[in-house]
């Protein structure tokens, strides 16, 4: 990934021994409590980052938001409009499935 994009300043996570970078912003659920005494937080979403890391962002989206600012929001809105248009076109026609049997056939009584 580092060959294609500048991932400096983004926190590297380790899963199964492989370094990974989150693409989307880390959105915690409502139960995620932010500790006030944490020194390292993401500049955009304030997600807690390991103290040993010198990273400024938790994900690529946060870094892009910092660099591009409001331009990223406009790009995201334009991409959502494109997906809405493609969703309208790609509606599949659902056929009604026929059942194999109308009523269950039981073994005759002897």
From Swiss-Prot:
Residues 95-104 have a biased composition (Basic residues). InterPro entries: PLATZ. Residues 86-110 are annotated as: Disordered. It comes from the Eukaryota. This is Uncharacterized protein At3g50808. It comes from Arabidopsis thaliana (Mouse-ear cress). The lineage of its organism: Eukaryota, Viridiplantae, Streptophyta, Embryophyta, Tracheophyta.
């Amino acid at each position: 990934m580092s060959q294609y994009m500048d991932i400096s300043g983004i926190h590297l996570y380790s899963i199964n021994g492989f370094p990974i970078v989150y693409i989307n912003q880390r959105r915690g659920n409502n139960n995620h409590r932010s500790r006030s005494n944490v020194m390292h937080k993401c500049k955009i979403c304030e997600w807690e980052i390991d103290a040993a890391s010198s990273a400024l962002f938790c994900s690529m989206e946060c870094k892009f938001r910092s660099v591009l600012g409001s331009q990223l929001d406009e790009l995201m809105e334009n991409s959502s409009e494109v997906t809405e248009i493609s969703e309208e076109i790609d509606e599949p026609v659902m056929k009604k499935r026929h059942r194999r049997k109308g009523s269950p056939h039981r073994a005759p009584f002897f």
